């Protein structure tokens, strides 16, 4: 008999795609999905077993949540961002061992990112109590699981899973013949992408300064900078800085665009620079590496360690140059990305978690 599984999800851009996966591949199994957030921003079709609450601070939503948590065999927490949910679970310790946490990144690194005020210290007491008792931890970045063990003294099981469709490579399998044809076109300048969002953890200014020390006028065509997701005030500041430093070569992406349109931009990129000091931008990174793009990131991050472990070549930000990687590296990276970051692998990993 299949386990009854409850998904509690902070509603973000990853979740509608995950709901599609559940409906497509696990339709005959007893899954309930409760999301909380702005469904107008991240819409999906609701049903009796898959539905949204705008907040978790009403009696009705909390009551339905508590009932659902007790009726299901396993609870999967998609992102641990809601203070209401953390506190609520702390007062039901008998549920903790059947809870698995899908680590997103920002929720794990909360102690680094949050403002250190009274609210932070109170919440960290609740978080430490809850996280230390959880039954499972879901992430494909092994370093993040080890960080959870170190920071929160966890003992729960590690489930390796790429979890969301945003981590599934959406491009083509590359052939040597196609690459030879592209190289024959002799493009004189490279296009660069910096960061993946308007989050200060992108460290845009640091990346801009590193890039500006290279031969920007003669070797760079465009500098793409995705800023549509995150802090709008910070986005405006980075747009202004980028235009000041790179002039008409700077292309800030300020508005959300359809995935197909965004993928066309990824196709144009030759070199990507990610200056994050933690695991972040993995969806972008995966799809750029799969497309044969040269990716630079900090070598002290868990994402760098993961990709290196998978045999995928990434370069240290300290060694930034405008030379693109060899054809052999392009082919090898594409093959490894296609094999690991596939929907087939995702579904198999989910089957293990759900069993």
Listing of model-derived features with the role each one plays in the protein:
Residues 124-177:
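A short, active-site helix/loop in glycosyltransferases that binds the activated sugar's phosphate group
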Residues 109-128:
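Nucleotide-sugar donor phosphate/pyrophosphate-binding loop at the beta->alpha transition
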Residues 74-76, 92-113:
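Active-site proximal beta-strand in glycosyltransferases
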Residues 237-256:
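Nucleotide-activated donor-binding/catalytic signature segment of Leloir-type glycosyltransferases, i.e.
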């Amino acid at each position: 008999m299949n386990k009854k599984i409850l998904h509690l999800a902070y509603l973000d851009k990853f979740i509608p795609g995950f709901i599609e996966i559940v409906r497509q591949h696990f339709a005959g199994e007893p899954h309930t999905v409760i999301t909380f957030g702005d469904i107008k921003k991240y819409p999906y079709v609701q049903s009796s077993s898959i539905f949204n609450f705008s907040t978790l601070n009403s009696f009705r939503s909390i009551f339905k949540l508590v009932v659902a948590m007790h009726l299901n065999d396993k609870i999967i927490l998609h992102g641990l961002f809601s203070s209401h949910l953390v506190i609520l679970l702390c007062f039901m310790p008998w549920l903790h061992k059947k809870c698995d946490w899908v680590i997103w990144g920002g929720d794990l690194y909360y102690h680094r990112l949050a403002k250190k005020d009274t609210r932070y210290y109170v919440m960290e007491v609740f978080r430490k109590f809850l996280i230390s008792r959880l039954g499972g931890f879901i992430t494909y970045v092994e370093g993040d699981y080890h960080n959870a063990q170190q920071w929160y003294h966890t003992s729960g099981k590690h489930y390796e899973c790429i979890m969301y469709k945003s981590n599934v490579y959406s491009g083509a399998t590359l052939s040597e013949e196609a690459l030879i044809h592209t190289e024959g076109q002799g493009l004189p300048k490279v296009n660069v992408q910096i960061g993946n969002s308007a989050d200060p953890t992108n460290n845009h200014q640091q990346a801009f300064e590193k890039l500006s020390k290279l031969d920007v006028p003669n070797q760079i065509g465009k500098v793409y900078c995705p800023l549509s997701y995150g802090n709008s005030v910070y986005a405006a500041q980075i747009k202004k800085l980028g235009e000041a430093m790179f002039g008409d070569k700077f292309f800030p992406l300020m508005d959300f665009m359809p995935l197909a349109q965004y993928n066309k931009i990824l196709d144009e990129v030759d070199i990507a620079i990610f200056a994050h000091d933690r695991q972040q931008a993995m969806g972008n990174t995966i799809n750029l590496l799969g497309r044969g793009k040269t990716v630079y990131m900090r070598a002290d991050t868990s994402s760098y360690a993961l990709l290196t472990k998978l045999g995928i070549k990434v370069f240290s930000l300290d060694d930034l140059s405008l030379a693109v990687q060899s054809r052999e590296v392009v082919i090898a990276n594409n093959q490894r990305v296609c094999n690991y970051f596939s929907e087939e692998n995702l579904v198999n990993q989910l089957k293990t978690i759900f069993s």
